From Swiss-Prot:
Organism encoding this protein: Haloferax mediterranei (strain ATCC 33500 / DSM 1411 / JCM 8866 / NBRC 14739 / NCIMB 2177 / R-4) (Halobacterium mediterranei)
Protein function: Essential cell division protein that forms a contractile ring structure (Z ring) at the future cell division site. The regulation of the ring assembly controls the timing and the location of cell division. One of the functions of the FtsZ ring is to recruit other cell division proteins to the septum to produce a new cell wall between the dividing cells. Binds GTP and shows GTPase activity.
Record note on quaternary structure: Homodimer. Polymerizes to form a dynamic ring structure in a strictly GTP-dependent manner. Interacts directly with several other division proteins.
Family of this protein: Belongs to the FtsZ family.
Entry's Gene Ontology molecular function annotations: GTP binding; GTPase activity
Entries under PANTHER family matching the protein: CELL DIVISION PROTEIN FTSZ-RELATED, MITOCHONDRIAL DIVISION PROTEIN FSZA
SMART domains named among the record's database cross-references: Tubulin, Tubulin_C
Subcellular location: Cytoplasm
The name this protein goes by in its record: Cell division protein FtsZ
Biased composition (Acidic residues): 1-16
CDD domains: FtsZ_type1 (cd02201)
Amino acid sequence: MDSIVDDAIDEAEDMGDGSAEVGGPTDINRSGTMTDDELQAVLKDLQTNITVVGCGGAGGNTVNRMHEEGIKGAKLVAANTDVQHLVEIGADTKILMGEQKTQGRGAGSLPQVGEEAALESQEEIYDAIEGSDMVFVTAGLGGGTGTGSAPVVAKAARESGALTIAIVTTPFTAEGEVRRTNAEAGLERLRDVSDTVIVVPNDRLLDAVGKLPVRQAFKVSDEVLMRSVKGITELITKPGLVNLDFADVKTVMERGGVAMIGLGESDSESKAQESVKSALRSPLLDVDISGANSALVNVTGGSDMSIEEAEGVVEEIYDRIDPDARIIWGTSVDDELEGMMRTMIVVTGVESPQIYGRNGEVQAQAEGRLEDIDYVE
């Protein structure tokens, strides 16, 4: 967690795919064997298409950080009503939502305006996510564009057949009651139209990082969102000691309901055990994981990481979670983490005082209904 804070602070201080065609059966040798080139073509055709859509300012910042960091195997889309912010974002595709509604001047902190802007730009949204197997929708809840547009984007993604995972922050208490109420309404809507919603409570983030200037606090929030999306994505797209595929992630995330995430790291001699303990103690993971119905675990380390160390992380989680829970885990290698290990845990089907609103069991009953929860003006 410390490096996340350090990275975010450094960032704040510094400031102030085409697919190959695959032939039919005639391309395969008569013997039934295939050349390496033919196998590579099949592999390319079968790769998971992942799209990350950043909605509003916070979502755009997440996409921008992923663009800077470099993410393997995902298309980055930034969608905003504020043209000034949008032009500064690094992304593969940019959508200026609701140009007629807002003239590119933002949503004025009104979620209704953000929703109407997204509905005006639905065709562009569908085009951006077309062909995706998995869509991440990331936003900061409480404001206008992110809160209003994220449910519209998630609904479009799910209707297109993609596994839809929303990763959102909830407001700092200091942002006021109106933003909190709007965040609650936005989260309710997202729960209705997403497979899984991962919630990052900004107030709990402050508990982890202590007192920081406002700008740096938001940078830390952006960094956590980026690490969360990147961690899940690269479980699928990057080779590792233990690889996961799209079907594995779908097993945990499809109809996962509300989830929370824990991030931990260690460079000690017992780095495997310490990184998982740090993740489990993370203020972001403000739940008793013993009641979770499933967990997704990503262990990242340098080239010196052994399979025994990675297995040690998972064994630690098995000891703490419901024995009937499903655990999917994988590892990825990052050469920059020599001598260090990072653990990311996503637990689904959880309840926490940090999660607003009703129990996720009624999600299916409200499927597709966006208009029955009011935002505050």
